[in-house]
Amino acid sequence: LNAVSPLAGIALCAALALAAQAASPTTATMTEDDPYLWLEDVDSPRALDWARARNAETRDALETRPDYAPAYAQLREIYNARDRIPEVVRRGDAFYDFWQDAAHPRGLVRRTTLQGLRAAEVAWETVIDLDALGAAEHENWAWKGMQCLGPAYRRCLVSLSRGGADATVVREFDVVSKRFVEGGFEVPEAKSSVDWIDADTVYVGTDLGPGSLTDSGYPRTVRRWRRGTPLGTTPIVFEGERKDVAVGVSIDMTPGYERTIFQRSVDFFRSKRFLLEGERLVPLDVPDDASVAFLRDTLLLSLRSPLTVGSETFAAGSLLVADADAWLAGQRKAEPLFVPTATRSLASWSATRDHVLLDVLDQVSSRVEEWKKDGSRFVQREVAAPFPGSIGIRALYDPLVDGVPAEAGRLARAATSDGSLAERYLFSYVDFLQPDSLMLGRTGSDAREPLKARAPLFDAAGMHAEQFFATSKDGTRIPYFVLWPKGLGAASARGDAPTLLYGYGGFEVSLPPFYSGGYGSQWVAKGGVLVVANIRGGGEFGPAWHQAAVGANKQKSYDDFIAVAEDLI
């Protein structure tokens, strides 16, 4: 293959988008001999003018091509397609979605029911129209999400930003009346965090003047704010250090298992956590770089570095479970639900009432496992699912609505619903040639109910995808996917096919198979070859794959990318 030919339709940008995790520039690299050092000041007028000039050159090169206009029109049609799969979130009996299209560029917050979601044409009910709200308030509002108080999920803390900035305004909203609450909770524009405690109390971290923010500009303190009291006079209940990235709080409202955990984020991946016991903050004895969650009487630890528990050491990338009360009492005993291998890593997990569902990447494609607690241990079941491709799992269980079973000496908590969603989950699937689909799954079964599926965005007849492996400079095997156009393949490649090579290699982000109407219609359908390189720095094989190419080792990401290019040739 020869990665040199331009696209016969539209010039698509392709680059190795290596995340900004490289080592700080050394004296050797930052010398006065570098003629481009002035570009380091990214906000300077000179740097911005240079970028504008390069953009203008690119626009001129693209827009003067005779095939630009039809390609542009086709891409607009693809990206504005109304059959996109809604990304719904369950709140009680309602399923909420945030939707943007050509008619609603700022977006709609809308809702339906599960029965409504099953319909071919969903009858959505608009809750907030961002375009209308912005026009009425003369603001350029961008949606930043909302946090609603269960089990009623009527009152929500809505976050809005001006023009998409990091700073937000937080306002209390009633989803039944579809109005902001007069005299309700409201936090002025800042990089804030606000979390419900109960209907009249929240935890808030925000900019309240000198000393309230970290050096990174995020909250340094958490206050307990009671409705009707001035925000500035509320008591500080937790604080971090100025050098921390931020502080925050997570609240588990599961009936009978209520827990509040404060945390100091000391950097991007590490946090120090404290469990609130009465009026006392107790350090949580877990690794700073682990992800921590509680599932009623079970503690789950997702490791980013090795951890020794008793006589056993668990590798980075493992998912451990432990008895929560025993662990908090200092009794260290854990069982692995997942241990990574050279070819398998844990992409994500989600919990129903009685199961933990794992999305496992096996050579960068998804497999699904179910784990169910059986007495004091967990037992596994493999879930039959399409392969190779990308799967997403989102459990629908809500303990505030679906109830809590009796266990660990605690009483059962009755459901306020019929409990029919306690063991259901949303299952999404996509690969290079099959558009997104959304199904409703149930634990203990491989059957799934189709809910939504996108129409194909390009003619995939004759196309096929394959996976290959290159050898990097240090001997590491680097996987990559190739999407072949009709009439081409590894055995029939002529050596002159236009080839687009893409990689990322940062922030532990993985690149499993995906479906792209843009690449498919404007590149592969016109004879181009698409190559996706799973280079180090990403998350394809867990934390170790990421950590192998950060800091002083960032060059390994580039070495991997070069190795794939050479393997193609």
Predicted regions and their residues:
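Intrinsically disordered, low-complexity segments enriched in Ser/Pro/Gly/Ala and basic residues
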Residues: 4, 23-25, 491
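Serine-hydrolase catalytic core recognition
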Residues: 85-88, 256-257, 353, 385-387, ...
